[in-house]
Amino acid sequence: FEGPWCHTGRWPKKGMDLAGKRVGVIGTGASAVQLIPMIAPEVAHLTVFQRTANYCAPLRNGPIDEETMNEIKENYPEIFRACNETAGSFMHEFDPRSAMDVSPEERLEQYERLWQKSGFAKWLSNFRDVMLPGEANEDYAEFVRGKIRERVHDPVVAEMLVPKDHTFGAKRVP
């Protein structure tokens, strides 16, 4: 590749003109998985250089309206107290049940419900054992792999993007 290059951490505020160009993206970490779908429609050709497949999940973040923000501010003391008592200091509490103690249908329903929520609920409000090595983690990992396969239409490419060498949560999930 020749021409301009840029690290995503130093992306120009005015952007880069990539229309009609051959573009290479090195890596499939957090920045890359946000960048790739944004530039893919405008470039002539996109090559992604991936060493290791990563789990990827949408955060579904969005703007917070003024009423909600005021509610948050009014409840700062309670929010900070709760965050001091939870994993990762987030406003989420693990479901005290084991994923393997409920039916496969109930697990899937919870996984899907949490997948649709914003923020880290899909990790930190899930069954207590999905973030630990073992059967529950593998079950949830397969759910996330399925989401990757759903999103990537080419099955050959999808399999290249599905992590097979580490448990879910062992690496930061972009």
Name each region found by the language model.
Residues 1, 14-15, 28, 43-174:
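N-terminal FAD-binding dinucleotide-binding subdomain shared by FAD-dependent oxidases/monooxygenases
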Residues 1-42:
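Glycine-rich dinucleotide-binding loop and its adjacent helix/turn
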